[in-house]
Curated annotation (Swiss-Prot):
This is Pyridoxal 5'-phosphate synthase subunit PdxS. PANTHER family: PYRIDOXAL 5'-PHOSPHATE SYNTHASE SUBUNIT SNZ1-RELATED. Its EC number is 4.3.3.6. The gene is pdxS. The keyword Lyase applies. GO terms for molecular function: pyridoxal 5'-phosphate synthase (glutamine hydrolysing) activity. It catalyses: aldehydo-D-ribose 5-phosphate + D-glyceraldehyde 3-phosphate + L-glutamine = pyridoxal 5'-phosphate + L-glutamate + phosphate + 3 H2O + H(+).
């Protein structure tokens, strides 16, 4: 049967609609409803949040289709779900379930250590993680409609997300000020498609939205990432590992929307209880660093 493929323009346009918003990880329909009521622009359906995936170890896979369907039916906002890097069938199954976006995610155990998915071959838009412009451009070249920093998921530590957003921004600025003659050499240095770098130079920015993810644990963290130029925020473990998830979720949304209103951020941050326990990323062994997955 011939598949109908969404165009890059349509997929990127769908992702643009989430700009300025918060996307929350949820593991059941109750959490999905809390996220929607708090003002999330979308939810990410998965069986365990990144901190629990990290603690459990073993192989992390796509969520059970029954759970994904339950969450889709429980909310009116878009629903995303994660597939393992390079796992063609997980992605096809999620597409068949009717998810609005697929996250080809390093949070799950990669299925393929050589190839990422050919995301242009799907109707549903994809979101992918990146640490630098080389990774960002390769994922866009494969058809990703939305990017996010990798950060270091499940740590509650924002330092890696900050590093990644700053690195991408600096490299984008460098490309914008290059001559076209220099772009091919830069494409070689970055391992990036020349056509994507040309789009960046001509538009003055990435051709897709780039959200912050990986370590957002407080309203101030969310506001910081927006201040640094992120187009929106993914929050994984931070909300439902906090003492007051409903209040915490609303505070994250407010801080993301009004990221430069520091009095408002101070107000919404009051009486939230203790944030999730964090992990010093420098204490992680190399095989525990999820951001290293993919290329």
């Amino acid at each position: 049967m011939e598949r109908k493929l969404g165009t890059d323009r349509v997929k990127r346009g769908m992702a643009q609609m989430q700009k300025g918003g918060v996307i929350m990880d949820v593991v059941n329909s109750e959490q999905a409803k809390i996220a929607e009521q708090a003002g999330a622009v979308a939810v990410m359906a998965l069986e365990r949040v990144p901190s629990d995936i990290r603690a459990a170890g073993g192989v992390a896979r796509m969520a059970n289709p029954s759970l994904v369907e339950e969450i889709i039916q429980s909310v009116s906002i878009p629903v995303m779900a994660k597939a393992r890097i390079g796992h063609i069938v997980e992605a096809r199954v999620l597409e068949s379930l009717g998810v609005d976006y697929i996250d080809e995610s390093e949070v799950l155990t990669p299925a393929d250590e050589v190839f990422h998915l050919n995301k242009s071959d799907y109707t549903v838009p994809f979101v992918c993680g990146c640490r630098d412009l080389g990774e960002a451009a390769r994922r866009i070249g494969e058809g990703a409609a939305m990017l996010r920093t990798k950060g270091e998921p499940g740590t509650g530590n924002i330092v890696e997300a900050v590093r990644h957003i700053r690195e991408v921004q600096a490299q984008v600025n460098k490309v914008v000020h290059m001559s076209k003659d220099e772009l091919m050499t830069e494409a070689k240095n970055l391992g990036a498609p020349y056509e994507i770098l040309l789009q960046i130079k001509e538009n003055g920015r990435l051709p897709v939205v780039n959200f912050a993810a990986g370590g957002v644990a407080t309203p101030a963290d969310a506001a910081l990432m927006m201040e640094l130029g992120a187009d929106g925020v993914f929050v994984g473990s931070g909300i439902f590992k906090s003492h007051h998830p409903e209040k915490f979720a609303r505070a994250i949304v407010q801080a993301t929307t009004y990221f430069d209103d520091y009095e408002r951020i101070a107000e919404v941050s009051k009486d939230l209880g203790e944030a999730m326990t964090g992990i010093d990323v420098h204490s992680l062994a190399a095989d525990q660093r999820m951001q290293e997955r993919g290329w």
